[in-house]
Amino acid sequence: MKLTYHGHSVVKIETNGKTIFIDPFITGNPLTDLKAEDVHVDVILLTHGHNDHVGDTVSLAKKNDALVIAPYELATYLSWKGVRIHPMHIGGSFTFDFGKVKLTQAFHGSSYVEENETIVYTGMPSGILFHAEGKTIYHAGDTALFSDMKLIGEMNDIDVAFLPIGDNFTMGPKDAAIAAKWLKAKMVVPIHYNTFPVIQQDPQQFVSMIEGIGRVLRIGESIEL
């Protein structure tokens, strides 16, 4: 399994012959190394409906005939835009041919702002547990610290956890460090920081708080499990 960080909350997973993107915010993302027109994707996983997470989902899904997996309301909304969907909800899991997906809770919001400035409610936000090739990945999405992260850590042997550290909209570094302790992941990668002025953080400072399990991935850098 190969994991690549593409800035903000964008994570690419390559496993079992499939290319999977989590929260493909590419167009308008000042940090990413990608161009949407060059991206190949088989599956898109979405944590919630905010524009900086849905990103290029519709155009990528249509171009690649990619399956979009998302919380029910968000998936339904995207189906009206002509994409293939698999709706899920918090606590539910499903085994696909490329791996097993389970949605966890997240403490955040979920809505999509249309070009005409209409705000569309898109259900509850989520985190994602992804299991494949004997490995477990946890992408927390956008979230505050919440005590059931302890339960997520107890129920899952997490190899890599992607945690937001930007503060303001999500956990900041101190809360994310507590989350890392509770999750008991073998490796913790900070995400959702430095994309915009309001979420400026020093990821190395965060890594120094979590006792040797943290790793800062440069934009476009990969790890193999």
From Swiss-Prot:
Residues annotated as signal peptide: none
InterPro entries, alphabetized: Metallo-B-lactamas, RibonucZ/Hydroxyglut_hydro, UPF0173, UPF0173_UPF0282_UlaG_hydrolase
Superkingdom field: Bacteria
Keyword Hydrolase: yes
GO MF, any single term: hydrolase activity
Keywords of the record: Hydrolase
Family: Belongs to the UPF0173 family.
HAMAP family: UPF0173
Protein name: UPF0173 metal-dependent hydrolase Aflv_0488
Organism for this UniProt entry: Anoxybacillus flavithermus (strain DSM 21510 / WK1)
Lineage of the species this protein comes from: Bacteria, Bacillati, Bacillota, Bacilli, Bacillales
